[in-house]
Amino acid sequence: MPRFAEQQLYIGGQYVAASSGQTFDSINPATGEVLAKVQRASQADVDRAVASAAEGQKVWAAMTAMQRSRILRRAVDILRERNDELAELETLDTGKPLSETRYVDIVTGADVLEYYAGLIPAIEGEQIPLRESSFVYTRREPLGVVAGIGAWNYPIQIALWKSAPALAAGNAMIFKPSEVTSLTALKLAEIYTEAGLPAGVFNVLTGSGREVGQWLTEHPGIEKVSFTGGTVTGKKVMASASSSSLKEVTMELGGKSPLIVFEDADLDRAADIAVMANFYSSGQVCTNGTRVFVPRMLQARFEAKVLERVKRIRLGDPLDDATNFGPLVSYAHMESVLGYIEKGRSEGARLLIGGTRVSDGDYAKGAYVAPTVFTDCRDDMTIVREEIFGPVMSILIYDSEEEVIRRANDTDYGLAAGVVTRDLNRAHRVIHKLEAGICWINTWGESPAEMPVGGYKQSGVGRENGLVTLGHYTRIKSVQVELGGYSSVF
């Protein structure tokens, strides 16, 4: 019997039954336990949610900036009060350790909501003088109803990253979480309602991307789609959104990010960064630095330091506070990652550690894969070219700065990049040549609310977080005012 009651859709400020009559299972990837039956939205439910959002958006947009700001700040307070219970639910649903969800997922999501709540009164237009008798002013107006489509690795954080700027700008949002991890997005909807958000301004539709996601991207009542997920799916979403009604899109997609260690680097720091950039969240982070470039002269020393740290990783029950490495999100994803590991072996990469499923005792019930490090990798290997989205580090050896920059950029992706060096002149010089939207110097992975997040090339379109993102959720109206006479040519 499932641990939780059957999960309904959230439309118009309340839970409602899906008209499809169908459900799917939410599975705990650490144990195989069915957490809940989750209702599958139908196309009629999408229509119902869009209609509810359109009505709610009118009420929301008519409120003053300070009224909207206070409601979102109240939601921030509730999120922080319920941090621990939300973190436990996120851990059950994703398999991520409590040591992570308790201090990152809800905390950073609430930070983003607080950031945008504070910016609401600053959404303003311009006044442009033309001549003594005439001027132009601009208004930043909300788009209306927008859709957010989330990924399974950071469910509530992504829901907050997408909804915070959208709601701050006066829009309503219909959010579709990944069918793999749907539970905390529904809790977020409850919190928004409790905080005073008008009915319909934040709706949650659960179901598959192939169905619900596509219906949202095609719906004529939706003005924008913000999607987080894989590049292949992102291309489909973008094509559907543009062909249906020229919707605006924001895409945060895949990555195969380079981490470059230079010969003057503090090797202990470099190894710490490399391990964090590959094994945090069991490697299921889009910005992970999975291509680790190391100077030939440092290869043996660097590998030894990485191995020392990987052996300290505490794989275990994600509900145990001592655990810092949990299972992958699902059995299907585990099989995908194991397939890539086998590819690495068959294509000639040298395995330093890991490379197997962990199936001793109770671990056999879960989707556990050991932290894996390959070295002597080549740029043409599958594990180097394709996004694995799992705990697999590829070490590549280089001989010159010019060479490593060229090879680091030799990818279809451009989400993130980083360098480790004591020479800040070199750090900035190299970073400015790397084709990536998010870059780190002597660190990795932090994405504060103030920092725009997004990729180059096939890693995305537009940005999330930061001041710039508010512009993605408004449209500019230009108004000319003439105070003097008017002369017709006719």
Swiss-Prot record:
Residues annotated as the enzyme's active site: 162, 252, 286, 464
Pathway: Amine and polyamine biosynthesis; betaine biosynthesis via choline pathway; betaine from betaine aldehyde: step 1/1
One of the GO biological process terms: glycine betaine biosynthetic process from choline
Cofactor field: K(+)
Catalytic EC class: oxidoreductase
Residue numbers binding K(+) 1: 26-27, 93, 180
Pfam family, one: Aldedh
Catalysis performed (reactions): betaine aldehyde + NAD(+) + H2O = glycine betaine + NADH + 2 H(+)
Protein keywords: Metal-binding, NAD, NADP, Oxidation, Oxidoreductase, Potassium
Modified residues (Cysteine sulfenic acid (-SOH)): 286
Enzyme Commission number(s) from the entry: 1.2.1.8
Residues annotated to bind K(+) 2: 246, 457, 460
SUPFAM superfamilies cross-referenced by the UniProt entry: ALDH-like
Stated family: Belongs to the aldehyde dehydrogenase family.
The name this protein goes by in its record: Betaine aldehyde dehydrogenase
